[in-house]
């Protein structure tokens, strides 16, 4: 219900003509960034970039969740804590976009805040289970779920082809692929 209300608020604040397609942007701005096609054990992408590079909203949306505390421990290795500092938004396309291992989250970024494509959400880092690794942005694309459903939040489709398109200035939407992943999961 909360997510529906957030979408309604977003729609009222930022009305978009019915024919206008969402605009997508690459989630790391003003820095050299590289990434592979596949993640090590589930659908996501690690975008390698220098610490402090801007993590930006890839689409207009509403902030869903923010984690400002890095409580991950290698001893317990709890999945819900692996992302360290993180931000997830629900895009105007109804898809969740998740960035984690951040070194910093921007002041004012909080659940319910409306963001625009390209707006800085935080900075690339190595928090959570990335502690001790090269800085990178873990980037996941998924469908919205109940709070705390970290296995979905971290990613359900491989983002690389969308990242390739967005980096080239093209608006390739992951909506159909996310809907298919959700249906395949029986959700």
Q: Language-model segments: what does each one mean?
A:
Residues 17-86, 92, 117, 126, ...:
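Surface-exposed, glycine-biased beta-strand/turn segments
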Residues 65, 101-104, 123-126:
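A residue-level detector for short acidic-glycine micro-motifs
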Residues 72-78, 124-138, 144:
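Active-site loop architecture of trypsin-fold serine endopeptidases
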Residues 140-169:
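Short peripheral tails and domain-boundary helices/loops at the edges of structured domains
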Residues 39-42, 91, 101, 136-138:
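Histidine-centered active-site/metal-ligand motif
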Residues 86-110:
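Active-site region of chymotrypsin-like
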């Amino acid at each position: 219900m909360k997510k529906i209300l957030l979408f309604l608020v977003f729609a009222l604040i930022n009305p978009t003509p019915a024919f206008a397609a969402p605009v997508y942007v690459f989630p790391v701005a003003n820095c050299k960034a590289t990434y592979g096609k596949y993640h090590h054990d589930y659908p996501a992408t690690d975008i390698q970039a220098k610490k402090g590079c801007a993590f930006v909203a890839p689409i207009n949306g509403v902030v869903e969740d923010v984690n400002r505390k890095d409580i991950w421990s290698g001893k317990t290795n709890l999945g819900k804590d692996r992302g360290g500092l993180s931000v997830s938004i629900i895009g105007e396309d109804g898809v969740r976009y998740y960035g984690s291992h951040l070194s910093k989250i921007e002041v004012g970024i909080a659940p319910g805040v409306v963001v625009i494509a390209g707006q800085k959400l935080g900075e690339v880092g190595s928090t959570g289970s990335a502690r001790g690794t090269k800085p990178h942005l873990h980037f996941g694309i998924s469908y919205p779920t109940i709070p705390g459903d970290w296995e979905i939040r971290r990613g359900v489709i491989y983002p690389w082809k969308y990242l390739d398109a967005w980096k080239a200035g093209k608006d390739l939407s992951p909506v159909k692929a996310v809907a298919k992943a959700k249906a395949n999961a029986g959700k």
